[in-house]
Amino acid sequence: MPLTPTATRELLAQLGHQPKRFLGQNFLVDGNIVRKSLELAQVRRGDAVVEIGPGLGTLTGALLEAGAEVWAVEKDRTLHAHLSSTLQPRHPDTFHLLEADAVEHPLADLPAAHAAAFKIVANLPYAIATPWLDAVLGGPLPERMVLMLQQEAAQRYVAMPGSKSFGAISVFLQSAYEVAPGHRVEASCFFPRPDVDSYLLHLVRRAEPFVFTPEVKALIRSVFQQRRKQIGGLLRDRLPDHGASWLARLTAAGLSSLTRPEAIPTELWRALQVRES
């Protein structure tokens, strides 16, 4: 599969395909980054791996050659047809390709039989990163994820309480995953070259991952949408019957009703779900 900018440009010309910016189509052209992705994910023969937006198949081909069984979802019809005619005939038993929206099919229709032990390795289209990740965190959870992301998005996902980047997605992600050392990726590793640098985010599922219910996730999101307001007033509006008991937990942790959402640690947000259940 193509790994150089020239080969990628030539293949796109053969396909009559112009990279679509709104789909985040920046194709990986650096073999070292492909190898690093597989290394971080600890891909082994027989692993079940989900890939999002396989594009021209550079990462996909490497996963298949490593012996993984791959479930991939690609929204672009031209790229889906290309993968169907190139990779599927070579790997008819281990490559499963779905033409669909990844946010609606976040695990590429991975069979339930593999849901207990699978990984996600993806050069993730930047435009869908947060809604897709939010959908994945609803479970079942992959044991490991290696995600190519815009560096700014990666920083937001792993931000700590007290920082301006800390938000609802930070709470959901860090409650289920530990952040392992990743890898910075320069814009020159892609064609077309994006305007920003990227980052390989490496996530390892916690021994006891915490999954928020849709109702509590919606509550937390709504609170962070008014992140500069004090938590006491926000909860009085949203939880008139139960907010007081959770605020008591805040006080016990050295915080107060005057605290802003971005300063509240993830374990206290988890306690909100326990209280509501």
From Swiss-Prot:
What enzyme category does the UniProt record give?
A: transferase
Query: What is the annotated role of this protein in its UniProt record?
Result: Specifically dimethylates two adjacent adenosines (A1518 and A1519) in the loop of a conserved hairpin near the 3'-end of 16S rRNA in the 30S particle. May play a critical role in biogenesis of 30S subunits.
UniProt keyword DNA-binding, yes or no = no
- Any idea which positions bind S-adenosyl-L-methionine? 26, 28, 53, 74, 101, 123
Q: Name one GO cellular component term.
A: cytosol
Coarse class of the primary localization is: cytoplasm
Q: What is this protein called?
A: Ribosomal RNA small subunit methyltransferase A
Subcellular location as annotated: Cytoplasm
**Catalysed reactions, as listed in the record:** adenosine(1518)/adenosine(1519) in 16S rRNA + 4 S-adenosyl-L-methionine = N(6)-dimethyladenosine(1518)/N(6)-dimethyladenosine(1519) in 16S rRNA + 4 S-adenosyl-L-homocysteine + 4 H(+)
EC number(s) on file: 2.1.1.182
Cite the GO molecular-function annotations of the record.
16S rRNA (adenine(1518)-N(6)/adenine(1519)-N(6))-dimethyltransferase activity; RNA binding
The organism's place on the tree of life at top rank: Bacteria
